[in-house]
């Protein structure tokens, strides 16, 4: 009880993504650029998909909500990190840390599910195009979206209370750039069995199952593409699928490292780098890879510019 009362009073200190040295200004500038580019790219995607009738399709509906999640996701973590660097301190209250942990888990869980279900959407579009209007109807799209948000919310409501109710009797310095659950666990003392059990169940449900759906869908897509008679169409489809798989592998791979590998494989530097992949880099790559390279999206952008 004393440890919990002290934590509520003192809060925590975030050590940040990088230390203050002669290169820190460069890294700060890079992260600033990535953050603003991600916000602009996702904002453009949301705007175009909402105003252009040509993009009012199930696929772009899901992509617009992926952009919404990415915008919320990166906004939960990066602004606080940048302000901490400028102010030269990383203090965060217990309530703010709990809120950040809750929000990032919810957004991350929602994105895990949405990416998995979007891979299924692409599988149906390429492998069963004649049945696409039936299998991916607007009703199904809303169900996909609702299940993604429900999965993310369930992740937050399960893990956040358990994580933040642990007694933090070791140190109040978090060697990380945000309040990530596995890092918080290292500061805790006492019995962690309940947390580890819930974490294992959540990892199977939130990571391994969606990643298996993604892998199976894209494997089937690649087989179908390989059987295409048109060499140009096959080349274009392979290029699109490979870029999508790169983003998905980066996102899921980094998260699998963070949440499934034993503690003996982890170091603070590795944890920060892998976390940066799926919290900072992925929200920028998603709109670039999934959407802005798409001819329909670029056509919509040109039509908007022409009307201005």
UniProtKB/Swiss-Prot annotation:
Transmembrane segments: 29-49, 58-78, 99-119, 146-166, 204-224, 237-257, 272-292
Cystines in this chain: 97-179
Location(s) in or outside the cell: Cell membrane
Top-level taxon in the UniProt lineage: Eukaryota
CC annotations in GO: plasma membrane
Cited Gene3D superfamilies: Rhodopsin 7-helix transmembrane proteins
One example of a Gene Ontology biological process annotation: detection of chemical stimulus involved in sensory perception of smell
Pfam families listed in its UniProt record: 7tm_4
UniProt cross-references to PANTHER family, sorted A to Z: OLFACTORY RECEPTOR (PTHR26453)
Task of the protein: Odorant receptor.
Homology family: Belongs to the G-protein coupled receptor 1 family.
Protein name listed in UniProt: Olfactory receptor 2T6
Provenance organism: Homo sapiens (Human)
Name of the gene this protein is made from: OR2T6
């Amino acid at each position: 009880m004393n440890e919990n009362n002290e934590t509520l009073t003192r809060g925590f200190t975030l050590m940040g993504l990088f230390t203050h040295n002669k290169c820190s200004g460069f890294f700060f500038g890079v992260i600033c650029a990535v953050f603003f580019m991600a916000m602009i790219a996702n904002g453009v995607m949301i705007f175009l998909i909402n105003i252009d009738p040509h993009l009012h399709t199930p696929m772009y509906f899901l992509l617009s909500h992926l952009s919404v999640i990415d915008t919320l996701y990166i906004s939960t973590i990066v602004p606080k990190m940048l302000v901490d660097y400028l102010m030269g301190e990383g203090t965060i209250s217990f309530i703010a840390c709990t809120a950040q942990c809750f929000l990032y888990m919810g957004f991350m869980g929602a994105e895990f599910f949405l990416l998995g279900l979007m891979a299924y959407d692409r599988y149906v579009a390429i492998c069963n195009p004649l049945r696409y209007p039936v299998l991916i109807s607007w009703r199904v799209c809303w169900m996909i979206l609702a299940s993604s948000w429900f999965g993310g919310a369930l992740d937050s409501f399960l893990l956040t209370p358990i994580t933040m109710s642990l007694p933090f009797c070791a140190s109040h310095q978090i060697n990380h750039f945000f309040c990530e659950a596995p890092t918080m666990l290292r500061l805790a003392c006492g019995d962690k069995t309940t947390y580890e059990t819930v974490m294992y169940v959540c990892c199977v449900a939130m990571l391994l199952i969606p990643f298996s759906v993604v892998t199976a869908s894209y494997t089937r897509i690649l087989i179908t593409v390989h059987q295409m008679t048109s060499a140009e169409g096959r080349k274009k489809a392979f290029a699109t699928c490979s870029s999508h798989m790169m983003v998905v592998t980066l996102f899921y791979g980094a998260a699998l490292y963070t949440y499934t590998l034993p503690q003996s494989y982890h170091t603070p530097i590795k944890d920060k780098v892998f976390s940066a992949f799926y919290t900072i880099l992925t929200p920028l790559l998603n709109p670039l890879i999934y959407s802005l390279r798409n001819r329909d999206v670029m056509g919509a952008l040109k039509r908007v510019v022409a009307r201005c």
